[in-house]
Amino acid sequence: MALTQERKREIIEQFKVHENDTGSPEVQIAILTEQINNLNEHLRVHKKDHHSRRGLLKMVGKRRRLLAYLRNKDVARYREIVEKLGLRR
């Protein structure tokens, strides 16, 4: 299921760095994580949906690049977002 505007607004409010923030790496990573989790649930039911699986892999790659960017730019912010989202177990 696609991410609703309401859910996206909630994520932005939770992870924004400053007022009117919608594009910071933290917000982008949080939104991608939510989409990845939704798509994972879809693929558990629809195992042969290879088109969606490719979209999932693209999203995971984009999130990985954003995490690498954030880690290089500010390690404290990187650790905080990883902790909040429960990534890197």
From Swiss-Prot:
GO terms (BP aspect): translation
GO function terms (MF aspect): rRNA binding; structural constituent of ribosome
Zinc is among the record's keywords: no
InterPro entries noted in UniProt: Ribosomal_uS15, Ribosomal_uS15_bac-type, uS15_NS1_RNA-bd_sf
Any single Pfam family the record assigns to this protein: Ribosomal_S15
Keyword NAD carried by entry: no
SUPFAM superfamilies noted in UniProt: S15/NS1 RNA-binding domain
GO CC terms of this entry: cytosolic small ribosomal subunit
Alphabetical UniProt keywords: Ribonucleoprotein, Ribosomal protein, RNA-binding, rRNA-binding
Subunit structure, interactors included: Part of the 30S ribosomal subunit. Forms a bridge to the 50S subunit in the 70S ribosome, contacting the 23S rRNA.
Family named by the database record: Belongs to the universal ribosomal protein uS15 family.
Role according to the record: One of the primary rRNA binding proteins, it binds directly to 16S rRNA where it helps nucleate assembly of the platform of the 30S subunit by binding and bridging several RNA helices of the 16S rRNA. Forms an intersubunit bridge (bridge B4) with the 23S rRNA of the 50S subunit in the ribosome.
Name this protein carries in UniProt: Small ribosomal subunit protein uS15
Lineage of the organism: Bacteria, Bacillati, Bacillota, Bacilli, Bacillales
